[in-house]
Every structure is written in structure tokens, then in C-alpha cells.
Design a protein with these regions (language model features):
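Catalytic-core segments of thiol-dependent peptidases
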Residues: 88-122, 247-343
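Bacterial N-terminal signal peptides
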Residues: 7-20
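N-terminal mature-domain "stem" immediately C-terminal to a signal peptide or N-terminal signal-anchor/transmembrane
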Residues: 25-70, 74
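C-terminal soluble interaction/assembly domains
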Residues: 322-397
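Alpha-helical scaffolding within the catalytic cores
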Residues: 44-49, 312-319, 343-351
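Structural recognition of the beta-strand scaffold that forms the well-ordered cores
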Residues: 32-34, 59-63, 99-102, 245-248, ...
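Extracytoplasmic/secreted envelope proteins and their assembly/folding machinery
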Residues: 42-47, 57, 77, 81, ...
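Structured catalytic cores of large enzymes
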Residues: 69-70, 74-270, 375, 401-415
Length: 417
């Protein structure tokens, strides 16, 4: 997983002070449900969820788009974004809708815009140069030679040019794009700062909040998985989530006097995993187990798992967990929501859902580490009990128009007050 130079100067805010950013307790009538008429079971699951949660029938929008796990940018704009935008403008003039729920059967990923003919020609030329450079580097005896270093430097430059021509940084999760459906002309390259993110200090971002929707998805390998998630989430709310909280850091937590406020990338997130564990422990809600070894939790080491956050096993789920009904967790790695349907895939989101988790999140493509929800923030909001799953995600997730997907009942409150 890649790291950039961006770092977060977190503002540690009490939950009550954030009511201006995002109203407490998302309500059923504030959710717009999207179902895909081209996907078997999608409409049926949408109606099942809406009936169980008491969402008005008028809040269902039935669309027709591919049921594959990715779609072309043009199809997304024409078949998803445009009709949703039209609905919101014509039938939600009072702006009651705060959340979009994407149902089983929608693509996970929106491809970048296609290349022009001249861009294709240039990409083909660069591809040939890339192949020639790879062959040349392979012929050189020593990677330490000046000639090899120069070839490798040129190869890196060619790769970046190809990536730019293919507009690879304009691909995104469908869910992250649809959050900005009311912002018709936003920049596609890279990410857009999330104005709900509680870690940003910039007050001028508040003006964008009325143009942004929070988004969740009810999806999984099968229809039965989705129904289980719905049913378990609602049942768990009646008694509260029980079990243990597991946190899998890579390094021991440094002493407080060594804490670096400008900690970046991996170090920042590893420290945040430790802080999340401490928050859960102080709450007294669940017993906490922290692993700070280089080795991840191993098979069978995590019985009664209710909460989880850890890293790093790329696209290779470790069967360490016995998931409790209503459990919530995520694994910080680059590929963990690239598919929910490929049978042999071992990506974490798919496998956790298959094994019994009720809510998770992950990227559909390389996100960079700082695109993940900040662990200590996400779990603090979730533990509070006033915030729903979707709100906890929105408040702790730094970017929209990027790679992340939240899977779970948006109204779920595992520690409901």
C-alpha cells in the first residue's frame, strides 16, 4: 500500500460539538435506496430492508445498469448519477435525504473516462518503450550499474506517463462518486476532501456539506449474506453488541512522550489502532485484545470477535475470527473490496462477510493508507451510541470521489443508547 506526504493534524473534538457537521441519528425517511432492476434480487432486497426499517416507499429509486462489478464512466453518469440527481432535485426539494443506500447488484467501481484516439496512440508508443526498457534492464547484469539506474528511472517516468494518459487516478468506487451527485462538475482526478471529516480544521469546508451525501451499501457474495446483515444488525440493536474487540497493530505503542504530532502514513495509522483499542478499553463496553507483533492474529486466535481493526495482509484473509452477530471491523490493505462476488477471492471484505461480519469497509483500488477511516475516530463515534454506522464512517473518512466502500446497514447502532 502506498503512502503520500499528507498527514492529519487531528482535532480531538467531543462528540457533542460535531452536531453542526452532521445531525445526530440518521432517520429512516432520510435514506434514499437505490436498486438495480438488471440484477436479480436487488429490488427484492431493497424492499425487504425498507419494510424492516420503515423507509417510505417513495424513497426507492429503481435503476438499470450493469450488474458487473465495474462500469464505464459514461454508463455511471447516464444510468446512475443523472436519474439520482433528477430525483433529488424534483422530489427532495426540502433536502430531507441525507444518505444514499446502494443495494446488492450495483457495480463497485466506476472506470476512468476513456482515452481519445491521440491519447491511445501515445499510450501505445509509451507501452512499447516500457517493454523495451524492461527488456534492457533484464539484460543488464547489475542493478547497481549507472546504466541500470538510468533505465529504471526512465521506466518509472514512462509508467507515470501511461498512468496519466489512462486517467487511472480518475477511477473510483461508485459509492464514493454518488456521494457527490449534487456537485455536477467536481474534479475527477484524485480525491475530494470530505467536508464531514472531523479531523479537518478548515471551517470554509462547511459550505460544501449541503452538497454532499453520506453513502452505505448493502451487498455481499449472496442474497442470503445481505439478508443476514440486515437481520443481525436489527437484532443486535435490541441488546447491544457483545463479544471482544481485537486490534492488530504492527508495532508496540510508543510512549506518550515520544508521540509525534506530525506522524504520517503507516506510523499514524498504527498509532491510531492503539488509540482505538484504548478508547474501547476505557469505555468498558468490551474486553480488548491487542496484538502488536509483526505477525497478524493467526487462525483461531480471535473467538467472539465483535470489533476489529488491523493490518496488513494484502488480499489474503486470515481466518482468525469467530464473528459475533452484529460484528463490525475492517482491515487496512489496498485490495480488500475489489470484489464481493469472485468465488476464489480472499480479499478481506468478501471473506469477512462470508464468515459472518455485519459491517465492514475497504477500497476497490489502491487508496493510499490515509484514505481509510481513522480507527480511533470511527470507533469513538460508533461506541458513543448516538451515531449510526453510516454517520460514524462519514465523520472518520477523509475523502470522497475515491476508493472506499462502506458495507452495512446505514442505520445500525451496535451500542444504541
Amino acid at each position: 500500500m502506498k503512502v503520500t506526504g499528507l498527514f492529519f493534524m487531528l482535532v480531538f473534538l467531543v462528540v457533542g460539538s460535531l452536531t453542526a457537521s452532521l445531525s445526530l441519528a440518521l432517520e429512516p425517511h432520510e435514506i434514499l435506496v437505490l436498486a438495480n432492476r438488471n440484477a436479480a434480487k436487488s429490488v427484492g432486497l431493497a424492499k425487504y430492508y425498507m419494510e424492516r426499517r420503515g423507509i417510505p416507499e417513495r424513497n426507492l429509486v429503481q435503476l438499470w445498469v450493469t450488474d458487473k462489478e465495474w462500469c464505464e464512466r459514461e454508463d455511471y453518469e447516464k444510468r446512475v448519477a443523472a436519474p439520482v440527481r433528477e430525483y433529488l432535485k424534483e422530489k427532495d426539494s426540502n433536502r430531507e435525504i441525507r444518505c444514499i443506500l446502494v443495494l446488492y447488484g450495483f457495480p463497485l467501481k466506476v472506470a476512468p473516462p476513456g482515452m481519445t484516439e491521440s491519447e491511445k496512440e501515445e499510450a501505445n508508443r509509451l507501452q512499447k518503450r516500457q517493454d523495451a526498457l524492461k527488456a534492457r534492464i533484464g539484460q543488464l547484469k547489475s542493478g547497481d550499474s549507472q546504466e541500470a539506474k538510468e533505465a529504471e528511472a526512465e521506466l518509472e517516468g514512462v509508467r507515470k506517463q501511461i498512468s496519466s494518459l489512462k486517467k487511472e487516478d480518475q477511477a473510483a468506487s461508485l459509492d464514493s462518486e454518488i456521494s457527490l451527485v449534487l456537485m455536477e462538475n467536481f474534479r475527477l482526478s484524485g480525491w475530494i476532501p470530505n467536508p464531514f471529516f472531523a479531523g479537518y480544521k478548515a471551517k470554509d469546508m462547511a459550505r460544501d456539506r449541503d452538497k454532499v451525501l453520506i453513502v452505505s451499501r448493502l451487498d455481499g457474495p449472496t442474497e442470503a449474506t445481505v439478508k443476514r446483515v440486515i437481520d443481525e444488525s436489527m437484532e443486535t440493536e435490541k441488546t447491544g453488541l457483545t463479544g471482544k474487540a481485537y486490534f492488530d497493530a504492527r508495532w508496540p505503542r510508543p510512549s506518550e512522550e515520544k508521540n509525534n504530532k506530525k506522524d504520517v502514513g503507516y506510523g499514524f495509522y498504527d498509532r491510531s489502532i492503539h488509540r482505538a483499542a484504548e478508547l474501547v478499553k476505557k469505555s468498558g463496553r468490551l474486553p480488548v485484545v491487542v496484538n502488536d507483533r509483526q505477525e497478524l492474529f493467526q487462525p483461531g486466535e480471535c473467538p467472539d470477535a465483535a470489533l476489529y481493526c488491523g493490518w496488513y495482509s494484502l488480499a489474503k484473509y486470515v481466518d482468525a475470527f469467530q464473528w459475533r452477530p452484529g460484528s463490525v471491523g475492517y482491515h487496512i490493505a489496498s485490495s480488500e473490496c475489489q470484489t464481493l462476488k469472485q468465488k476464489e477471492s480472499q480479499v478481506w471484505c468478501k471473506r469477512m462477510l462470508e464468515e459472518g461480519i455485519a459491517a465492514t469497509m475497504g477500497p476497490v483500488g489502491e487508496p493510499y493508507v490515509q484514505a481509510f477511516p481513522v480507527p480511533e475516530m470511527f470507533f469513538e463515534f460508533l461506541l458513543d451510541g448516538s451515531w449510526t454506522l453510516a454517520e460514524s464512517y462519514a465523520l472518520s473518512q477523509p475523502f470522497w470521489s475515491w476508493q472506499m466502500v462502506l458495507i452495512g446497514d446505514p442505520l445500525y447502532r451496535p451500542f444504541k443508547r
